[in-house]
Every structure is written in structure tokens, then in C-alpha cells.
Amino acid sequence: MESMVNDPTVAMFASLFVALVLAAAAIPKLRSQDEFLGVVANYKLLPGFLVAPFAKLLPWLELGCAIALLVPSLRVLAACVAAALFMLFSFAIAVNVGRGRTHIDCGCVRRPTSMSRIGMFHVLRALALAGMSLYVAAVPLEISGISIESALTALASAVMLSLIYMAADLMVGFPATKHKLEIYKGNSND
């Protein structure tokens, strides 16, 4: 087990996966900045004068971390910043879930038809991403020790898991899926 934890292929996979998640979160926010401003305001955690600067800065910080995770000399710092961001997201979501404000949009991966509401799943997901980011920061990655085959395996695995991650987030946001989930929870309005 220890050899797998310290395996450079696993470390490369984790770095690429976190980078892809951060990029996938940042790019739609940059495209729809006004909408994301509303999402940040809906969390009701920041004083009004900080909402706009935070909403403008966050996607750039996410994108910067995503890029920096691919630069060996910046990888550890970027992973630490990413872990802090994911812990911040977890805290913000948990506070609102605790307040009973689960009707607000997560803001995780923005899209025009987003209906993704927050819940404990989002808290746990953000904590898992924080844990993976801390793993990236803790495990050294020696690129020279990775074969081409291992690097391609890490890349393919990271891309596939990122696509699954985004597809799951997208599917939960579809109105029909949301309705079916509410029926299973016993919250149907029918």
C-alpha cells in the first residue's frame, strides 16, 4: 500500500485531476461573471462590499491553481492553495446547509441550466478534493521517474475521472433528475 501512496503515477494522476476540476470550475465562472456574483451573494457569508471582488477573484485563483499544478516548481504551493479553497468551499456550504439554505446553487461548476442545490454531499465532495490536494502537496513528484506509459495512464485516468465528476454534477442539475431524486427522498410535490 505504501508503494502505491508514493507512486509517482498516482501523484501525477492526482495533480492532473485536481487541475482539471479547478479549470472546469473556473472557466464557466469567468464566462458568466454576473451570474456567479449572484451565487456568491446567495451564500450570505460575505459583507456586501466584498461579494463582487471575491466573485471576480475566485475564478482567476482557481484557474491559476490549475495551471500552477502543472508546473513542477509551483505544484506544492498550488496544491496547498487548492486545498485551502476546497476547505473554504466546504465550510461555506456546510454553514448554509446548517442554516437550512439548501435551495441555493452550489456554484461549483457553472452552467446556464444549473439547478445543483447544496447538501452534505457537496461538503463531503469538497473535503475529498481538499484531501486529494493535500496528497498532491505531500507526495513528491519526480517526472524523470515516470515512464511515458505511466504518464499517459495518469493523464487518461485524470481526464476520465474529471469527465465522470462533471457528468455527475451536470446530471444532478437536470430538472427531471432533480425531481426523481426528490421522489426517492420522499419530497415529491406531486
UniProtKB/Swiss-Prot annotation:
The answer on whether this UniProt entry bears the keyword Cell membrane reads yes
Q: Which domain of life is it from?
A: Bacteria
One cellular component term from this protein's GO annotations in UniProt: plasma membrane
What keywords appear on the UniProt entry? Answer: Cell membrane, Membrane, Transmembrane, Transmembrane helix
Biological process terms from the Gene Ontology for this record are: methylamine metabolic process
**Membrane topology reported for the UniProt record:** Multi-pass membrane protein
Q: Name one Pfam family in it.
A: MauE
Q: Which InterPro entries match?
A: Methylamine_util_MauE
Q: Can you tell me where the transmembrane regions are?
A: 8-28, 49-69, 77-97, 126-146, 154-174
Q: Where in the cell is it found?
A: Cell membrane
Pathway annotation: One-carbon metabolism; methylamine degradation
Function in brief = May be specifically involved in the processing, transport, and/or maturation of the MADH beta-subunit.
Protein name as catalogued: Methylamine utilization protein MauE
Q: Which organism is it from?
A: Methylophilus methylotrophus (Bacterium W3A1)
Q: Name the encoding gene, please.
A: mauE
